[in-house]
């Protein structure tokens, strides 16, 4: 940008390259983030800081120095309280020094906010051993909403022998308090 004052003196603005944060969702419960370096003609970046939205507040999760790789892998396994949605932003702290006009300040530039969605997964056991190692049959949901959850267990005659709408309530291999006969049961 060029501006001219009343004396016909021209002033040119500095060029700036903003931070663009991008990312990929990976199947192994990780989010891969990367961003370009912030650039400003008469400024020097002193650090980059990566923030993650945790409970509605952006919290610092990593700090980088200029010259570091601008890349982060966020392991989100076990963080399913937000149904698989994760939001991030990057801040660049820089010193702006323009001696000709007496400017020497430390400033911050923010990237875009990037939100990534992990896909929901369901893990279902393939066997139950009443009074054994795997004594409760119930699926485990990761990054899924259990609002419409329903599970039914059927015997070999197609009769419902267990039913639950509560994800935390699994089948213990009993019907009316008695352990069922070994065999195949469908769900």
Language model segments and positions:
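Residue-level detector of high-confidence beta-strand sites
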Residues: 15, 61-63, 163
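Beta-strand-rich modules
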Residues: 1-9, 72-102
């Amino acid at each position: 940008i060029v501006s001219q004052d009343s004396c016909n003196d021209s002033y040119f603005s500095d060029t700036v390259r903003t931070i663009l944060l991008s990312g990929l969702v990976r199947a192994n419960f990780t989010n891969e983030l990367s961003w370009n370096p912030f650039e400003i003609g008469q400024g020097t970046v002193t650090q980059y800081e990566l923030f993650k939205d945790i409970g509605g507040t952006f919290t610092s999760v990593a700090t980088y120095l200029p010259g570091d790789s601008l890349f982060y892998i966020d392991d989100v396994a076990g963080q399913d309280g937000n149904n698989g949605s994760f939001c991030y932003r990057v801040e660049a702290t820089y010193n702006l020094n323009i001696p000709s006009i007496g400017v020497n300040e430390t400033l911050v530039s923010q990237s875009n906010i990037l939100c990534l969605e992990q896909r929901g997964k369901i893990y279902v056991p393939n066997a139950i051993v009443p009074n054994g190692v795997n004594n409760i049959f119930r699926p485990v949901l990761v990054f899924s909403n259990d609002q419409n959850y329903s599970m039914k267990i059927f015997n070999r005659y197609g009769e419902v022998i267990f039913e639950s709408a509560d994800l935390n309530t699994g089948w213990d291999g009993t019907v009316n308090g008695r352990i069922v006969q070994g065999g195949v049961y469908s769900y």
